[in-house]
Curated annotation (Swiss-Prot):
Its cofactor is Zn(2+). It comes from Delftia acidovorans (strain DSM 14801 / SPH-1). The lineage of its organism: Bacteria, Pseudomonadati, Pseudomonadota, Betaproteobacteria, Burkholderiales. Zn(2+) binds at H78, H241, D245. Catalyzes the hydrolysis of UDP-3-O-myristoyl-N-acetylglucosamine to form UDP-3-O-myristoylglucosamine and acetate, the committed step in lipid A biosynthesis. Belongs to the LpxC family. The gene is lpxC. The keyword Membrane does not apply. This is UDP-3-O-acyl-N-acetylglucosamine deacetylase. SUPFAM superfamilies: Ribosomal protein S5 domain 2-like. Its EC number is 3.5.1.108.
């Protein structure tokens, strides 16, 4: 039986929110089988649980936000990407503010945090959402076209193409492919940082956003070049960060996907639209588990791999 996973011990981190600039404490705790991933706002007068789901996503401007009632948690995608990348199914995430800390702008710090806590196999079958026919969402036409799509695949792979007219991006490659069974998430994807332009940062800060952003947690560019003194972590770091975001956004469906995801100029909003479009078509997917590791897609049966 391919088993569910949680973490072995409690682990903690402290940081600031990318947009709020607010100090936040994060506590990750083991959870029982079939709990799923549950964020808990422990700073509120009465703590509020927010289980992840496609329907729990309430805002996708600049980041993925989940919420229930009046309680929200912003910028969940990097942490969710790390959780998905390590194949974890059940975790409680206690948080003392309304935004997940940005840490270094990638998911690498979250991966380290989770691996430090240890991975524990649980006595319950891991359940997947398997895509059994294509599902696609599109917006715009011509130069404004963007789309995202699922196709059937015995595993989970992603292909993402970006389209930024900027010398630094053009020179590094605008398309990346990643296969969870063939490649190594922690080595190939996790260190890719979020990125932005100085002119956009100034505009965002004038609106009370990006208050916690800087060169310590983002790739920052002017009109011509990368301004970070240490340059890029990967040659194609921009497109790889979009893969990182997509892995986190798509895991908000609440279970690991068996599908080939491809996208052109997609973002948090379109990723969530794709999840909702999939769930709205019951004949396009099915829930599956695997009685033996030999039946399971390559990669999912392996223990979470370190750096």
């Amino acid at each position: 039986m391919l088993q569910q996973r949680t973490i072995k011990t409690i682990t903690r981190a402290v940081g600031v929110g990318l947009h709020s600039g607010q100090r936040v404490e994060l506590t990750l705790r083991p959870a029982q089988p079939d709990t799923g991933i549950v964020f808990r706002r422990v700073d509120l007068p009465e703590p509020v649980d927010i289980p992840i789901s496609a329907e729990a996503v309430t805002d996708t401007r600049m980041a993925s936000t989940i919420g229930t009632g009046g309680a929200k948690v912003h910028t969940v995608e990097h942490l969710m990407s790390a959780i998905a990348g390590l194949g974890l199914d059940n975790i409680y995430i206690d948080i003392t503010a309304e935004e997940v800390p940005i840490l270094d702008g990638s998911s690498a710090s979250f991966v380290f945090l989770l691996q430090s806590a240890g991975i524990e196999l649980q006595k319950a079958p891991k359940r997947f959402i398997r895509v059994i026919r294509p599902v696609e969402v599109r917006e715009g036409e011509g130069q404004n076209l963007k789309w995202a799509r699922f196709d059937p695949y015995h595993g989970f792979k992603l292909r993402f193409e970006i389209d930024f007219a900027h010398p630094a991006v053009d020179s590094t490659g605008q398309c990346v492919e990643f296969d969870m069974g063939e490649d190594n998430y922690t080595r190939d994807i996790a260190r890719a940082r979020t990125f932005g332009f100085t002119k956009d940062v100034e505009m965002l800060r004038s609106h009370g956003l990006a208050l916690g952003g800087g060169m310590d947690n983002a790739i920052v560019m002017d009109d011509y070049k990368v301004l970070n003194s240490d340059g890029l972590r990967y040659d194609d770091e921009f497109a790889k960060h979009k893969i990182l975001d997509a892995i986190g956004d798509l895991y908000l469906i609440g279970r690991p996907l068996l599908a080939a995801y491809s996208a052109f100029r997609s973002g948090h909003g379109m990723n969530n639209q794709l999840l909702r479009a999939l769930l709205a078509q019951p004949d396009a997917w099915e829930l599956v588990s695997f009685d033996s590791e030999r039946q399971a897609p390559k990669g999912f049966a392996q223990p979470a791999r370190a750096w």
